[in-house]
Design a protein with these regions (language model features):
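N-terminal beta-strand motif that seeds the catalytic metal site of vicinal oxygen chelate
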Residues: 1-20, 86-87, 140-205, 258-263
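Hydrophobic, proline/glycine-rich low-complexity stretches
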Residues: 2-19, 27-32, 47-51, 61-62
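Vicinal oxygen chelate
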Residues: 7, 16-24, 82, 88-132, ...
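Amphipathic alpha-helical segments
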Residues: 19-33, 103, 203-219
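Short secondary-structure junctions
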Residues: 30-37, 111-114, 216-221, 279-287
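Conserved short beta-strand elements that form part of the metal-binding/catalytic scaffold
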Residues: 32-80, 132-139, 218-255, 295, ...
């Protein structure tokens, strides 16, 4: 099923309790406030993006990487609640990923994991309010492997740090002595985009069916407790798992964490083909977009150019 063309994910909205702490954390990524405003619910909103004057590859009309919504009275979700597992920031190349790792490490940012997924290489973090973050780069598409059913081959293997850091260091002695030209301010120096979203759900079959059958995302891979879905042959734009949330608690309005994420269509024909598939019970309109609510109460905005 190849329903869509010209589609992109846009930065998630995170409902945060301590705005100052969260803002300071993400500024270490090189993100800066690009717009401040009051949301429809009266909460202060800050859109964060890269400085187009210092980040080659960033464009002035790029959507924000992330939006923080301040709600000091938000409740903290249970570890078994549905919601955000991580949002994933895609760097343009391997050198950018290596430079971002060194830059963030020099600023004291703590990493919680590293992985080689065959199709990509990844760094994992958690922000001060335990929102998961993946920073990754893709391997060239010609290196991706598919089975006879068109499912992409992915795995979770140890990341080869020596190979990754060799993108920055001229030799092993420099690596040992940490003689890198990378400075603290050089995270995401060539820009980045949102590559995918990974959600915690309570019923994998129901959520997979929702995104696959109702929204038309292609099922690219399954593994115990997880599904990976995509559009246009990418390895995954959306991942779902029940590793800690199986038969757990649906997302509740007013909880900290993921407020919503956005799928942006630049092709009106694809957008129009999608709308009749969506159950009216899961859909409502908002200013300039349509909000779809999945079986766990997670909200996804659907936006189209010229809407």
């Amino acid at each position: 099923m190849q329903m869509y063309s010209q589609i992109r994910l846009e930065g998630p909205i995170l409902r945060v309790i301590d705005l100052d702490v969260e803002l300071a954390y993400y500024q270490k990524f090189g993100l800066i406030p690009i717009r401040r405003f009051l949301g429809e619910n009266g909460h202060e909103m800050i859109e964060l993006g890269f400085d187009v004057n210092t980040t080659p590859g960033s464009q002035s009309d790029n959507p924000p990487i992330l939006t923080l919504m301040h709600d000091s009275s938000a409740s903290r979700p249970s570890h078994r609640s549905a919601g955000l597992f991580h949002f994933a920031i895609l760097t343009p190349d391997r050198e950018s990923l290596a430079a971002t790792f060194v830059s963030l490490e020099k600023q004291g940012i703590q990493f919680v994991g590293f992985a080689d997924h065959l199709v990509s290489e990844s760094l994992y973090l958690q922000d001060p309010e335990n929102n998961g973050i993946e920073i990754y780069c893709d391997r060239p598409r010609e290196l991706w492997q598919f089975d006879e059913y068109g499912h992409v081959q992915m795995d979770t293997l140890a990341l080869n740090f020596q190979s990754l850091l060799s993108e920055l260091y001229s030799n092993n002695d420099d690596m040992i002595m940490n003689e890198s030209p990378i400075k603290e301010s050089m995270a995401f120096l060539r820009g980045a985009i949102i590559g995918h979203m990974h959600l915690k759900v309570t019923n994998l079959a129901a959520s997979t069916d929702f995104y696959h059958e109702m929204l038309g995302f292609d099922l690219m891979q399954t593994m115990p407790g997880a599904s990976f879905l995509s559009i246009e042959g990418y390895h995954h734009r959306l991942a779902l798992n029940t590793w800690r949330s199986r038969a757990g608690i649906s997302h509740k309005e007013g909880e900290s964490g993921l407020e919503q994420f956005t799928v942006h269509f630049t092709d009106r024909a694809s957008y129009k083909r999608l709308l009749p598939r969506i159950s009216k019970s899961s859909l409502h309109t908002a200013i300039n977009n349509i909000i779809v609510t999945d079986p766990d109460g997670i909200k996804m905005a659907l936006v189209c150019d010229g809407q």
